[in-house]
Amino acid sequence: RVLVYASGKNRGGLSQSIIDHWETAIYEDDLWRLFLGTQQPPADWHGISFDENTWTSAPGGFGYGDDDDNTLVPDTTTSFYYRRIFTVTDPTKLDSAILSMDYDDGFIAYLNGVEIARSSNMPDGAVDYLTDTQTDHEAQMDVGGNPDGFHTSKAKMASLLVVGQYVLAIEVHNVVPPSSDLSGRTWLHFGINSSDVFYGPNPPFFGNVTTTAYHTNFKIGFGETVTLYGADGSLIDSI
């Protein structure tokens, strides 16, 4: 199954890397640093040099309303921010990355301050702690589903990774409050191009993650017809 967003954002899919195996570097229930969005966080909150010691240390995931959160936040929360530091010892062996996100309603993810994923219901450009999502999005794992997967290409990985410490930082936003639920559950997986082992085993759901990395370079308006053709030009379906 391939999920394609007609978003106009023109984002490609998985690179043709040769991956020996996958490992998980960050888990949902690891200890993270958490900041509630009652005010704007410092501008460098998603960078590795930020002093996170004033933020709360708590196990993920975070949220309220779905009975699937290890750390509860107030049910009046519009947004919250969380981050976790990890180490890369040999970036040449990390060919690909997938961020697994189970979220309600929207999020933006950063690696050392560089954006690597954004849910399709978040506005483009800069956002602040009061930004609402454009539509709602329900978390899936509490009803037996799987998180969404967001792929980071080999080319982008090469531009980001050197030996040293990294921080994965996430901001989660609610749809127009009051909302019945809010959730952020996060895993970070790496595709390893050798038999070397750097991190931990993958969670059970990982083999079923849908990588939501495909976005068209056009948008579809209300009432327009969508037509699917095969590689030979034959009509497959239309709606």
Please report, for each region that a protein language model flagged, where it lies by residue.
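Acidic side chains
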Residues: D51, D90, D102-D105, D181, ...
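Short, glycine/acidic-rich beta->alpha junctions
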Residues: T78, M101, T210
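Acidic glycine-/aspartate-rich tracts in secreted/extracellular proteins
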Residues: A6-R11, F35-P42, G61-G63, D90-T92, ...
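Solvent-exposed beta-edge/loop recognition patches
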Residues: R1-H21, T135-T186, F190-I239
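Aromatic-lined ligand-binding clefts that engage carbohydrates, nucleic acids, or primary amines
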Residues: W32, W55, F86, T92-G113, ...
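Ser/Thr- (and often Asn-) enriched beta-sheet segments in non-cytosolic proteins
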Residues: V2-L3, S49, T54-T56, T71-L72, ...
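Extended carbohydrate-recognition surfaces in non-catalytic/accessory domains of CAZymes
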Residues: I18-L94, G125-T152
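Residues at beta-strand starts and edge strands
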Residues: T78-Y82, D95-A97, D105, G164-Y166, ...
